[in-house]
């Protein structure tokens, strides 16, 4: 064979005749790959997507939910293409699903050409979440996962996917396909229909009109997603972004729901911006392709715990003195207040929610009110709980309105329609609302949360919107008495500026007093000084047996989701008999003082003790709340709510005043007397109660009129 000539050795150059063919071929191959994935993907001998699609088609739902992990394991290149170019690839995926749906519906070839609605593909994706404030221009047209709270939802509107255009002059028709999201459409300005039989074609500019009866429409809803309060940096305002949901993703979610949105980060041009001439400015939004939302029980969808974590938590639950360890782990920077810490622990773990056969719900969340003097660490408790609780919202009473706590009605700037935005009680659904300065709220604002605290719903009837929002939250509130400090010489009704309607909704009410005690003051001073000086070695100053913060938070979450204790017979009997005894005791106290108690003891308080009992059992992951749990719950209730309800009566106050005046005459300045001698003289001799004598000594000591020496055994007159 002859050697090749010179021109035969050189490279051959060619120009592609149809440059779009290569792209068309790749799209066809991608669609074929998607069809193979849907038809052939198997887990444990189950064609999961073929089965899911068939089940959906039976109930006339033209959709398929895809887990991207499955697509990655089947064809990694295809999955990467979907993640990086979702706007181009997702329509191919939907076309592939529609093709498979036709095959499943119509086995015979003659029916295969029958048109069915385009099937929607929704995606489930477990990649790292991206906060709203971290979305940048580099994420445009990429698939992102964004967490947050839905604060607004519009009514459904219809959006065209294919417009049927008709020329006014020659009646030629044309189908115009429209992409998804907020993208607009530009109608063709010239009719390009061919000239028939040599007729003169004289179609004007902008000849097309839309034939709505032959156009294709889908449902569309606009949502507003806001950053969750626990993800907002200190000092920053929460940011929000618009969401565009269509077809089967509409009406899936209500304001106040926490969720993770999977979608395509896109941009659109605002009409007002266009009018001002800023044509290069675009506003971001997310085209929703998947929603992962909370479960129906009022808490976040069940979190995932590893086997090692579960074993560790079970080991913690078997710790002998777990109750004390947990209470010591509550705000360890605060000295003392053991019962308040135990009550807050009960609030964090909560009781068991119950749904009765008739559909009535009984709340399991515990509400606690801290009422007392300034400087008793009430606000510090609230701040600690806000950081520790899995879901928490902190607000101050003075800066909170009824709409800010419940829900407000907003008007959409574009459509001029009204929509709901959830307030603090709605945003904290499944968690805890911390309300500081509870006494500074206006009465009409405080009344707004009555329904939220007991029925755990918020009913709205404003601006033509009538609906009910969930607010399954615990309330931890802090307040000051009427006079700033609690006055022992006055009754609870004179100290507390709350109506009995709101007080009865609190499971535990603590009167926190700043009492003068030299030993206690010395211990508090040492504790605070250690905190300020040993910041690097702060573990030495904290409580023994403290659980690390992150582990404690996970343990609370684990107990709330995995355990729902029930009362046993002995505990139920004990609670029943104790409630009757408590009611009798309060009734006797009311008769003695000839006035109704400000803090009512009603059936709500029996339910409160039951919830406290269940939360104590939940701390140790016990499925049964025993008599021991009931005993501790009753003790907590007696030291909090009942102690506040049966504070000094007018008769005791009168006794205290008489003893106080008598002691001033009895003890000149510089003289002293033994405590035993005063008991013999005032209690045994004059018939006063020992409680009144102790109160009188405490009041005189706080006024620095007397000093209690030798551990309170000697009373020394030191001043006027």
Swiss-Prot record:
* PROSITE patterns linked to this entry: MCM_1, MCM_2
- Give the enzyme's EC designation: 3.6.4.12
The residues covered by the MCM domain are: 322-529
> In terms of domain of life, where is this protein from?
Eukaryota
Q: Record keywords: Cell cycle included?
A: yes
Decide whether keyword Isomerase is in the record: no
Choose any GO biological process term that the UniProt entry carries and state it.
premeiotic DNA replication
* Compartments where located: Nucleus
Placement of sequence motif Arginine finger: 504-507
Quickly give the catalysed reaction: ATP + H2O = ADP + phosphate + H(+)
- Positions modified as Phosphoserine? 350, 352
Keyword annotations: ATP-binding, Cell cycle, DNA replication, DNA-binding, Helicase, Hydrolase, Nucleotide-binding, Nucleus, Phosphoprotein
Named from the GO MF annotations, one term is: ATP binding
Amino-acid positions noted as binding ATP in the UniProt annotation, renumbered to this chain: 372-379
**Broad class of where this protein is predominantly found:** nucleus
**Gene3D superfamilies under this entry?**
2.20.28.10, mini-chromosome maintenance (MCM) complex, chain A, domain 1, Nucleic acid-binding proteins, P-loop containing nucleotide triphosphate hydrolases
Q: Which InterPro entries match?
A: MCM, MCM5, MCM5_C, MCM_CS, MCM_dom, MCM_lid, MCM_N, MCM_OB
Gene Ontology cellular component terms for the protein in this record: cytoplasm; cytosol; DNA replication preinitiation complex; MCM complex; nuclear pre-replicative complex; nuclear replication fork; nucleus
Instruction: Give the protein's function.
Output: Acts as a component of the mcm2-7 complex (mcm complex) which is the putative replicative helicase essential for 'once per cell cycle' DNA replication initiation and elongation in eukaryotic cells. The active ATPase sites in the mcm2-7 ring are formed through the interaction surfaces of two neighboring subunits such that a critical structure of a conserved arginine finger motif is provided in trans relative to the ATP-binding site of the Walker A box of the adjacent subunit. The six ATPase active sites, however, are likely to contribute differentially to the complex helicase activity.
Assembly mode: Component of the mcm2-7 complex. The complex forms a toroidal hexameric ring with the proposed subunit order mcm2-mcm6-mcm4-mcm7-mcm3-mcm5.
Q: Which PANTHER family match?
A: DNA REPLICATION LICENSING FACTOR MCM FAMILY MEMBER (PTHR11630), DNA REPLICATION LICENSING FACTOR MCM5 (PTHR11630:SF42)
> Which family does the record claim for this protein?
Belongs to the MCM family.
Return the protein name: DNA replication licensing factor mcm5
